[in-house]
UniProtKB/Swiss-Prot annotation:
Pfam families noted in UniProt: SMC_ScpA
Function noted in UniProt: Participates in chromosomal partition during cell division. May act via the formation of a condensin-like complex containing Smc and ScpB that pull DNA away from mid-cell into both cell halves.
Organism: Clostridium botulinum (strain Alaska E43 / Type E3)
Assembly notes: Component of a cohesin-like complex composed of ScpA, ScpB and the Smc homodimer, in which ScpA and ScpB bind to the head domain of Smc. The presence of the three proteins is required for the association of the complex with DNA.
Record keyword Cell cycle present: yes
Gene Ontology CC terms: cytoplasm
GO biological process entries: cell division; chromosome segregation; DNA replication
Keyword Cytoplasm attributed: yes
Protein name per UniProt: Segregation and condensation protein A
Taxonomic placement: Bacteria, Bacillati, Bacillota, Clostridia, Eubacteriales
Entry-linked InterPro entries: ScpA, ScpA-like_C
Length: 251
């Protein structure tokens, strides 16, 4: 049996791999062929020799679940309760897959919004009142002097400016690529080089605006993904602590 070509670095977790295999085999997420998916998934596990053990354990847990479901499919059903347990286990796995797919889609949406945020512009000020047009063909400029015409123009210009809906005009300077994830990544790497443990709140305190805070947080997530640091909290809403990984220090 031919297995699809798999690159370890392409996937962020076991459910990301499962979604890839389901799409690769053109399966419906609500009707997955567990036997076929399990074989391909186990081949992927065999290629994880150089992966971090903490990450590998997540894949192994899902692999064990797939093997158990597959074995129950192959074995004869003795009791009705066993059949129901098998269905519940498979249903639970599918529900987790669907939830992960929704979260991944939402994350991609917000990422696109962030990337395109620097390309948004507001429309020009609108005139609140409509100009009343008449069918009067009378030459209103007849017998007007040049000075009177000039004064009339200034009066109309003043009326126009006063009727602009300036309250809804966003006065904002847009900085294109002022804050880059690559730059923040270098800054954070230098920070953890000199400190055993750093507080994320201290990094945020030095940010000039909300956009810089967001870029700093994305850079931190990238460092976690690259296995450069560990992040943890003592409790919910406590300070996020950043610690350099020991294996990275040895390198």
């Amino acid at each position: 049996m031919d297995f699809p070509s798999i690159k370890i670095k392409d996937f962020e977790g076991p459910f990301d791999l499962l979604l890839h295999l389901i799409k690769k085999n053109q399966m419906d997420i609500y009707n997955v062929e567990i036997s076929k998916i399990t074989n391909q998934y186990l081949k992927y596990i065999d290629e994880m020799k150089f992966m971090d053990l903490e990450i590998t354990s997540e894949f192994i847990v899902v692999a064990a679940t797939l093997i158990e479901i597959k074995s129950k499919h192959l074995l004869p059903k003795i009791k009705k309760d066993e059949e129901e347990d098998e269905e519940d286990q498979e249903k639970n796995l599918i529900e987790k897959l669907i939830l992960y797919k929704k979260i991944k889609k939402a994350a991609e949406f917000f990422k696109d919004r962030y990337v395109n945020s620097g390309e948004l512009y507001t429309k020009k000020p609108e005139i609140i009142e409509e100009i009343n047009l008449t069918n009067n063909n009378e030459d209103i400029f007849k017998n007007l002097t040049l000075l009177e015409l000039y004064n009339m123009y200034n009066n109309l210009l003043e009326i126009y400016n006063n009727k602009q809906n300036k309250a809804n005009v966003i006065q904002k300077r847009i900085y294109v690529d002022k804050y880059k994830i690559e730059d923040k990544l270098k800054y954070l790497l230098g920070l953890i080089e000199n400190n055993e443990v750093s507080k994320f709140s201290e990094i945020i305190d030095k940010c000039e605006c909300k956009l810089e805070c967001i870029v700093s947080f994305l850079a931190l997530l990238e460092m976690v993904k690259l296995k450069k640091v560990r992040v943890y909290q003592s409790d919910s809403f406590d300070n996020i602590l950043i610690e350099r990984r020991q294996d990275d220090r040895e390198e």
